[in-house]
Each structure stands twice: as C-alpha cells, then as structure tokens.
C-alpha cells in the first residue's frame, strides 16, 4: 500500500519537479501517520497480523486475544508482544519504505507523528523508533500555552522534544524540525512567538516550520488553526526581525554536536504491558506516563544533560565499548532506569549486563522484573544487586548530584525554570540559555567561556 501511495503522489511530483529534488524541493513532509482504530475499544488488525505475530514470537495470538482487554492469562506478555509486532509492521511497511525512497531521490523525509499522545499507544507504539527513519526527524508544537506537567502538552512538553532530539543525536541527524504555533490564535504576539520558539530550541529543535501561510483566509480558512504567517497578521511587517533571530539560532544550534553523558531509558515497552482502553485499568498506564514526565522534567529543570533511549533504537544501534553504552553515534557513561521501567527487552538487558561488567554506571529507580513481558528472576536479581547498579529513591526529589558534570555546573535559586542547550565544536562550545520563570539569582560556572 505504501508503494502505491508513493507512486500516486511522490512519483507524480517527480515527473513535474524531479529536477528540483534535493534543491528547491528539499524534502517530503508527512503529517500524523498513525495506526489508530476508529473505535477506541478495538485493536489494530491487518490481514497477516497473526502470521507476523507467530513469526516474531513463536506462538499463536488467537487464543490470547482476550488478554489485550482483560487481565487474564499471560496478559503482560501478550500486550507487550502485540505492540512490538505493530511497531515493527509500521516501521517495515511505512517508515523504512519512505526513508529509502527519500534516500534514492536526495530528499529529506520529515514531518511528525502523533507524538503528544504518549503514553497512549493507540496512534503509535514508539515515537522514537519512527524518528530513526527520518532524514530530518520532526514534531509539532501547537497553541500558545506553556505546560510542563501534562504528558500530552505541546509547549512545555520536555519529553516530546527530548525524544526527537535524542533520536537525532543517536542516528547522526543534524536538523530537527518543529511545526510550530498552529492554533496559537489571531491574538498571538511576537513576544509569544519568541518565548515559545526559544524554549523548543533550548530542548533541541533547530529547524522551524511555521503553521500556516494560506493564500487566502476567506471563509472557513480563517479558522484553520491561526495565526497565519502572511500579511493578514498585524505584526507581519516586523516578522522579519524575529526570523533573523531564529535563523542565527538555527545556525548556532546546528553547529558541532550535543554530547550528553546520561541516557534515560524511556519506559515505553513497560507501558505496552499495561496498555488497554478498558476503563478503569487504563489509569495505571496513564499514571506511569505522568510520573515519567515529572521525572524527566525535573532532570531538565536541574540542568542534567541527558538523552532519552528507545529500546528499538538500542536494538538496532546499541553496543558496549569499554565502560561506555553506545547508541549509534553517541556514547554514554551513565544509564538511568526510571521507576516506571518494569520491563526491559532482551537486547536491552543483555547490553546492560555487559555494560555493568565493564564498569559502566547504571542508576535504577525501580526494579525491572520482566524481560519481553515475561517474569524474569534473572532480571530481578540483577537490578537488585548493589554491586551492579546504583539504587535511587523515586519517592525523593531528583538528586542532581548523581548526575554532576565536570564540564559545567549551575547554581540556581529555588523555583528556577532554566533550560539550556550545549554544543561542542572543534574550537569551543555554544551554550544557549532560556529562563522561563523569575529566579532570585543565577550563577554559571564553566571553563574558558566567551559570552556574547
């Protein structure tokens, strides 16, 4: 089906504008591809689902279908395995096909998914796994509201931006796109646009795709998630000044590389085990998502420099080199398992054991006891062994001292909301700071810095 879609769309464009591919036509933008079903209480099915499931996991899904709704039988295992199959079918039959077409035609595959739904798995089993197959991974950030708390927020959603930034770091992608400002309203100001844009750039975005620029706002068009980036907006004649700011920022934050020493594993495969739309059981995975969101937001607000880790990306790009945990183009000295990490996939577990044996540092806030959704005494024993892992208390506030860096440190007053982005180049570093709420003082300690 994807091949036919490409034939009817991109090949048609290629006939008329193929000479501009890779130049005037730099890429292909996709908007919210997903595997959601129309009935929220149904499950996604495809004609060869049961064959694909058996080939992947070695048993028949049919007698276990009830486990996708009810907590009967090996329901954690079945739900985990089912979401894993959906993810791989989506990757193999859509993402990899689109990626390959763009590679052949010098295009950047970009756009975004339904990344704000996490931890709801109905639309997409793993956001980061999708980003690994885009030449320019992307997200969207809508509205004019800043919300640090909700896993489903847009601006303020640390997880959403860290996912795309981390996947890009690990796969060697330089540019990260954000479809920004849709639905911010006709009354949005240039100050709002700068405030929101600066925040997402501090988290890793460096290619802004403004929503939207229609030729006309006649009729229903004026209600299509305004504002418009056209002369219809009252600040249009001044908009160039703001664009110059983001152009300079895009260049600076695309130069060199961001090399974070801490990898925080995202508990996506753990949430697979509990995912159901059967109320009230869905409250459990929603709570897991909210707690993880709170944890990584606390890390970011304490200026901990970290990437997020997808177990699918680790499967395809993970290794251990000395005391470094390798994920593609990045090497980490510390791996963090959040309290919500009840499951680790077999490949992840094997790498973590090798990492610990080589002297790598593992910080564990929880007690993973499942591997691929199956209870594992071996995993439970490993993660409880103080000689293998550093235990941390999830009930206590995040202790930034666990993640202290010898390269940079911040001394901040209570109540701070400072975000930063640091990039290294051959001849120095770039540090971008964004402060969101008032602080009584801010003091930065770094080595051999120039301030501009």
Q: Where are each of the predicted segments found?
A:
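Catalytic and substrate-binding clefts that recognize carbohydrates or anionic sugar/phosphate headgroups
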Residues: 1-19
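Carbohydrate-binding surfaces of carbohydrate-active enzymes
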Residues: 15-27, 32-448
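N-terminal low-complexity segments that are often proline-rich with Ser/Thr-Pro
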Residues: 450-452
């Amino acid at each position: 089906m994807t091949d036919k879609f490409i034939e009817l769309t991109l090949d048609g464009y290629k006939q008329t504008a193929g000479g501009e591919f890779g130049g005037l036509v730099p890429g292909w933008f996709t908007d919210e591809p997903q595997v959601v079903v129309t009935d929220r209480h149904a499950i996604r099915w495809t004609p060869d689902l049961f064959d694909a499931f058996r080939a992947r996991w070695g048993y028949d899904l049919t007698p276990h279908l009830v486990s996708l709704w009810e907590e009967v039988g090996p329901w954690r295992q079945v739900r985990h395995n089912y979401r894993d199959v959906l993810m791989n079918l989506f990757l193999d039959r859509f993402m990899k096909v689109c990626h390959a077409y763009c590679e052949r035609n010098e295009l950047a595959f970009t756009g975004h998914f339904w990344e704000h739904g996490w931890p709801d798995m109905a639309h997409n089993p793993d956001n980061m796994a999708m980003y690994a197959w885009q030449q320019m991974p992307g997200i969207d950030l809508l509205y004019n509201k800043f919300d640090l708390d909700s896993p489903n927020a847009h601006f303020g959603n640390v997880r959403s931006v860290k996912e795309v930034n981390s996947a890009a770091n690990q796969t060697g992608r330089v540019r990260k796109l954000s479809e920004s400002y849709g639905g911010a309203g006709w009354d949005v100001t240039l100050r709002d646009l700068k405030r929101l844009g600066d925040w997402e750039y501090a988290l890793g975005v460096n290619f802004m795709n403004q929503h939207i620029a229609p030729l006309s706002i006649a009729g229903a068009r004026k209600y299509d998630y305004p504002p418009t980036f056209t002369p219809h907006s009252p600040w249009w004649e001044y908009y160039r000044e703001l664009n110059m700011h983001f152009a300079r920022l895009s260049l600076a934050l695309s130069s060199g590389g961001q090399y974070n020493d801490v990898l925080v594993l995202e508990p996506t495969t753990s949430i697979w085990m509990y995912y159901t739309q059967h109320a009230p059981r869905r409250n459990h995975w929603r709570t897991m998502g909210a707690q993880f969101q709170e944890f990584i937001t606390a890390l970011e607000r304490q200026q901990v420099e970290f990437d997020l880790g997808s177990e699918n990306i680790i499967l395809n790009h993970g290794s251990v080199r000395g005391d470094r945990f390798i994920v593609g183009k990045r090497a980490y000295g510390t791996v963090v398992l959040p309290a919500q990490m009840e499951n680790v996939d077999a490949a992840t577990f094997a790498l973590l054991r090798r990492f610990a044996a080589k002297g790598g540092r593992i910080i564990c806030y929880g007690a993973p006891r499942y591997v691929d959704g199956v209870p594992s005494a071996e995993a439970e024993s490993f993660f409880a062994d103080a000689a293998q892992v550093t235990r941390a208390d999830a009930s206590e506030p995040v202790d930034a001292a666990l993640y202290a860096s010898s390269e940079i440190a911040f001394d901040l007053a209570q109540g701070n909301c400072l975000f930063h982005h640091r990039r290294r180049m051959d001849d120095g570093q770039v540090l971008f700071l964004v402060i969101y709420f008032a602080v009584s003082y801010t003091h930065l300690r770094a080595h051999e810095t120039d301030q501009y």
